[in-house]
Amino acid sequence: MNEFINIFSSSDPENVSSTVKLLLLLTVFSVAPGILILMTCFTRIVIVLSFVRTSLATQSMPPNQVLIGLALFLTFFIMAPTFSEINKEALTPLMDNKISLDEAYTKAEEPIKEFMSKHTRQKDLALFMNYAKMDKPESLKDIPLTTMVPAFAISELKTAFQIGFMIFIPFLIIDMVVASVLMSMGMMMLPPVMISLPFKILLFVLVDGWYLIVKSLLQSF
């Protein structure tokens, strides 16, 4: 314990460098959930997967752990080029003491800004820029993350809900057909969802639904 305290109180350059790296690592771990949710494609993916489960009316199948796990790995797959660039341009030089912490932050935010800008609607970005009374930026570097992140988040929410609406349509039709058949047969006390569930699962399996959903998500980026 004393050795750990001495690292923070030491003025030796090597110890100071180790202290900065440790603090940086702890900071990254503390803000990682927020970064993952709001600055990557995780938001769109997890919402679409949740819409799939809701439209099928399977309640807790697949479980939340499976959906979140799949969303995480899809996020890492889609964001791999961006993460690689951040590691190459910012993290590795910082760990090698070739650049300062401020330079590493500047270099790290460029790839993530570029990714977010590709999937952010101009209307959403203009909303936050106008509210902050910002001048029209000359380049992407002039847009702060405090403006880009919320604009990107609401753009992702809108896109995810649009995809979710398209997913709901075929299953809604099945529910309506089953409900009409049950009413015509006088079986109004029987829940239509109970009867339509096997047909919805059958349709989803026959069209290879998970493949189509994941393919659509990958192509949307």
Curated annotation (Swiss-Prot):
Cellular component terms (Gene Ontology): bacterial-type flagellum basal body; plasma membrane
The keyword Transmembrane appears for this protein: yes
Keyword Cell membrane: yes
Main location: membrane
Localisation per UniProt entry: Cell membrane; Bacterial flagellum basal body
Topology term for the membrane: Multi-pass membrane protein
Record keywords: Bacterial flagellum, Bacterial flagellum biogenesis, Bacterial flagellum protein export, Cell membrane, Membrane, Protein transport, Transmembrane, Transmembrane helix, Transport
PROSITE patterns: FLIP_1, FLIP_2
Segments passing through the bilayer: 22-42, 66-86, 163-183, 187-207
Family matches, as InterPro entries: FliP (IPR005837), T3SS_IM_P (IPR005838)
Pfam families: FliP
One BP annotation, GO: bacterial-type flagellum-dependent swarming motility
Domain of life the protein comes from: Bacteria
Role: Plays a role in the flagellum-specific transport system.
Record-stated family: Belongs to the FliP/MopC/SpaP family.
NCBIfam families xref list: fliP (TIGR01103), PRK12797.1 (NF009438)
Protein name: Flagellar biosynthetic protein FliP
Species assigned in the record: Bacillus subtilis (strain 168)
Name of encoding gene: fliP
